[in-house]
Amino acid sequence: PTLAVRNGHNTNQAKGYSYLYWKDFFNPRQQLCLGLLLREILKIKNKKIQEQFLCLFSSTLEFNNSFCSYKGEGTGAVRPIFFNHILKPERTPLENSVWGEPQSSGCFSTLYKTRFLKAKEYLNYPFEIKVNKDNNKYEKVISSQPLRPIFVDNWNDLTNTNDSVWVLNGDSARLPIPDNSVDLVVTDPPYFDYIHYSELSDFFYAWLSPILENRYPEFQADTSERANEV
């Protein structure tokens, strides 16, 4: 990645330690290994599958950089870069294995099993967690039929197509849907100024924008910052 670190609340924390480009967050060996992995992902001809693996690659970045450390004392799991939402370098950074092996933490091969395959399994067997009050144990309860949504890109198709889903990524203050058409709103509350998502998302944007800029206009900007964001 060649993207420079822009000024900001969180990014200035790293710039104070002379981390001026996002590539500086990775040592030369990590840059090489991640670059080789990314090159192989880009050989996948099916773009939908390729982009799923690009999402998995972005998760791998969190656990393979110079800001990682051990979780807890001793040689435990790998603690990723954003575990405490600041960009302060570790005194003794932990260098992880990019590809990994069965007992690894935060590696591409293990994240493939724990995140990618788990998500696919959930689509086939959606579940809820039930708590047994007698022994305080948890169990999974299959809660619906397999999820096989049909993705649409407008309101008319959404209302006229069974089992359809319309995914929007934009300004929630101006949704292109009719008034009084929403039955339920489920929201994840923001953290106000605790986490500066736009600044921190440049960590991933630096790797993905050169690949996706010719597919999606949203990736053509120099950074992930947008003029109308809060």
How would you describe each model-predicted region?
Residues 1-178, 196-230:
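Nucleic-acid modification enzymes, centered on SAM-dependent nucleic-acid methyltransferases
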Residues 185-186:
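Hydrophobic beta-strand segment of the Class I
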Residues 190:
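Conserved SAM-binding loop
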